[in-house]
Curated annotation (Swiss-Prot):
Presence of the UniProt keyword Signal in the record: no
Reaction catalyzed: urea + 2 H2O + H(+) = hydrogencarbonate + 2 NH4(+)
GO molecular function, one term: urease activity
Name this protein carries in UniProt: Urease subunit beta
Gene name, Swiss-Prot/TrEMBL: ureB
EC primary class: hydrolase
Quaternary structure, from the entry: Heterotrimer of UreA (gamma), UreB (beta) and UreC (alpha) subunits. Three heterotrimers associate to form the active enzyme.
Pathways per UniProt: Nitrogen metabolism; urea degradation; CO(2) and NH(3) from urea (urease route): step 1/1
Keywords of the record: Cytoplasm, Hydrolase
Length: 101
């Protein structure tokens, strides 16, 4: 074994298996690109993004940890969101929740 070496198991890894996902259409109405990270509370994402924020409350992107989705100015795309797990408490971000979901 080499220090830092990753030795994954055989087969396919399924992210967020069994999570109740929703798909939303999101439009960047701004004049700058917007990037949203994998674990950002999507309901509190940049105000220039136009989407159903109520449906996105308590949700994050269904993408690999440490990655992000970029929305170019004027771009509309669908994103898949999954619920936060654990205690389902959110703090920080744009401070619109600051506690239990």
């Amino acid at each position: 074994m080499i220090p830092g070496e990753v030795m994954p198991a055989d087969g396919t890894i399924e992210l967020n298996a069994g999570a109740q996902a929703v798909t939303l259409e999101v439009s960047n109405t701004g004049d700058r690109p917007i990037q949203v990270g994998s674990h950002y509370h999507f309901g509190e994402a940049n105000g220039a993004l136009d989407f159903d924020r109520d449906a996105a409350r308590g949700m994050r992107l269904d993408i690999a940890a440490g990655t992000a989705v970029r929305f170019e100015p004027g771009q509309t795309r669908e994103v898949r969101l999954v619920p936060y797990g654990g205690a389902r408490r959110v703090f920080g971000f744009n401070q619109t929740v600051m506690g239990d979901l």
